[in-house]
A protein has these predicted regions:
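Cysteine-nucleophile amide-bond enzymes
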Residues: 1-180
Length: 180
């Protein structure tokens, strides 16, 4: 396999109440995962808040590191990883992603899936994902096998623990410079 391109995995900690609750259980420094097709993170996708002011309104989202939810939490900390992939894998990932984009309204946030992680039992519903499940699903459906478990059991910390990803930045999201 000749890696021609890269995708980027953004893990964040906004410091919100929900994040603090999740962190108290996971003990992991980051509890949200997103995927981007460029270093600038201008094409950033995940499952999370559809509306910055309402943590209960969740689903498939195109995120923006300068506006939206992240602008409400300027002290958000993050880690960004690079995964080298082939042109063909990127093509497959974008094809899978476009299915989500075309039908974005039908997707919901898989809140019960988070309980499944705690119980180590996958909880899967049609058209329902949580953030790391979505990112793992995009990778898996594109033929990229990182873990020996279902996407419904992948946590944001699993990305951090994998040696397949190359660390490119850790710090405040608002201070991230893709040119550095």
């Amino acid at each position: 396999m000749v890696a021609d391109q890269s995708v980027f995995i953004l893990l964040t900690n906004t410091g919100t109440f929900l994040t603090r609750v999740i962190k108290s259980y996971t003990r992991a420094p980051y509890n949200h995962a997103s995927i981007s097709f460029n270093r600038e993170l201008s094409e950033l996708y995940s499952f999370g808040r559809k509306t910055p002011n309402n943590p209960l309104d969740g689903g498939f989202v195109k995120e923006d590191i300068k506006t939206g939810t992240y602008s409400r939490f300027p002290n958000t900390t993050c880690v960004i990883y690079e995964l080298q992939v082939t042109d063909r894998e990127v093509e497959k990932m974008k094809r899978v992603l476009h299915v989500f984009i075309r039908s974005r309204q039908k997707y919901m946030y898989n809140l019960l899936g988070l309980i499944g992680i705690a119980l180590k039992e996958p909880v899967e519903f049609s058209n329902s994902y949580f953030c790391s499940q979505f990112v793992a699903e995009i990778l898996q459906r594109s033929g990229i096998k990182i873990w020996n478990k279902l996407p419904a059991l992948v946590t944001p910390d699993d990305f951090r623990q994998s040696n397949r990803f190359h660390l490119i930045y850790e710090g405040k999201l608002s201070e991230y410079d893709p040119q550095a």
